[in-house]
């Protein structure tokens, strides 16, 4: 029989610049906020990193994550790799919700860090306003190691 060698878990402690470098190409995230009763609310989201090193997520102001952040700014984001078994990291920080009209140009920046240039920025801006979008911005103040799952190291 041919058995693969067991994969050993990793946990690499990183600086803030190394953290942001790890996050930038990854856009699959799980955002956790706190409900009014103190329990966790988690949502799968698409996110990026802005020029100031904050995690940015586009959403709608009526969503539970926004309601929760307006009440309690504490948030946690797990950033996943495209490969589910790939490296991931948890980032904690203070979150804020930016509403329209202030959010329009921030949503342009969000799109750029996720997907690059849009073919028609005027159309994109109109769509963001028509859809009533907002932006969540999280400033990292604590993060775990960049980790992978597997067997505990010996």
Model-derived regions, located:
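Charged, gly/pro-rich active-site loop segments
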Residues: 1-14, 87-154
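Short secondary-structure boundary segments
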Residues: 81-82, 140
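Short beta-strand segments
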Residues: 26-61, 67, 75-79, 88-91
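Amphipathic alpha-helical interface surfaces
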Residues: 19, 65-68, 103-110
């Amino acid at each position: 029989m041919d058995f693969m060698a067991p994969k050993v878990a990793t946990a690499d402690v990183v600086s803030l610049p190394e953290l942001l470098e790890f996050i930038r190409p990854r856009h699959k995230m799980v955002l956790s906020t706190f409900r009014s009763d103190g329990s966790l609310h988690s949502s799968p989201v698409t996110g990026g990193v802005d020029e100031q090193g904050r995690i940015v997520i586009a959403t709608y102001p009526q969503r539970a994550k926004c309601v929760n952040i307006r009440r309690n700014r504490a948030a946690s984001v797990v950033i996943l790799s495209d490969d589910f078994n790939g490296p991931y990291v948890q980032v904690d920080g203070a979150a804020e919700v930016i509403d329209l009209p202030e959010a329009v140009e921030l949503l342009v920046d969000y799109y750029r860090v996720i997907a690059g240039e849009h073919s028609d920025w005027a159309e994109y801006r109109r769509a963001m306003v028509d859809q009533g979008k907002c932006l969540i911005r999280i400033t990292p103040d604590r993060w775990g190691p960049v980790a992978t799952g597997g067997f505990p190291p010996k």
